[in-house]
């Protein structure tokens, strides 16, 4: 009736497509607002992982030809089709997850951003695994983006990728708008 609309938003910092900051797992005190914008964009390789990925440990061998193409500073997007499970309990409870081997490989190769379709890079029901995988990646300086969707629509094996988080002061993470 006044000619305008406005809404109040209440968001969990790790809802939907989101990014984790090192503070999230106590790796350091670095928060989401302290990252430079350059950390959120660049060339990304799309690894298409076929088949049923339910509860699968994702390994370096699953990357296929991408394994030898990725250069230091490139990003890696893992297309598993898992975003299609978003309305099932399996989305959270039976997700494909990053193995220690793949996490360590990403650090050694200097991956800039690791993007996945599930809501986490590790089993959310196993705190030890969840903490271990996040810590390997975050201590290695890798930006983690979780909850991606529509990766199957990306053409080609590499894209220019951006995942821009809300600049939440002191945030342990934030929702992002991801585009490629």
Feature-to-residue mapping (PLM):
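Active-/binding-site microenvironments in catalytic and ligand-binding cores
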Residues: 1-180
């Amino acid at each position: 009736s006044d000619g305008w609309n406005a809404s109040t938003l209440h968001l969990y910092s790790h809802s939907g497509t989101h990014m984790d900051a090192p503070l999230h797992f106590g790796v350091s005190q670095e928060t989401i607002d302290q990252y430079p914008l350059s950390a959120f964009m660049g060339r990304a390789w799309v690894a298409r992982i076929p088949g049923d990925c339910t509860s699968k440990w994702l390994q370096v061998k699953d990357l296929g030809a991408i394994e030898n193409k990725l250069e230091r500073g490139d990003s890696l997007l893992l297309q598993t089709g898992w975003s299609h499970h978003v309305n099932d309990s399996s989305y959270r409870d039976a997700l494909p997850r990053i193995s220690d081997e793949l996490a360590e490989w990403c650090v050694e190769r200097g991956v800039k951003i690791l993007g996945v379709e599930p809501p986490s890079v590790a089993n959310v029901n196993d705190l030890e695994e969840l903490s271990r995988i996040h810590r390997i990646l975050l201590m290695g300086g890798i930006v983690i983006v979780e909850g991606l969707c529509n990766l199957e629509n990306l053409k080609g094996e590499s894209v220019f990728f951006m995942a821009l988080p809300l600049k939440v002061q002191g945030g342990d993470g934030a929702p992002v708008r991801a585009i490629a």
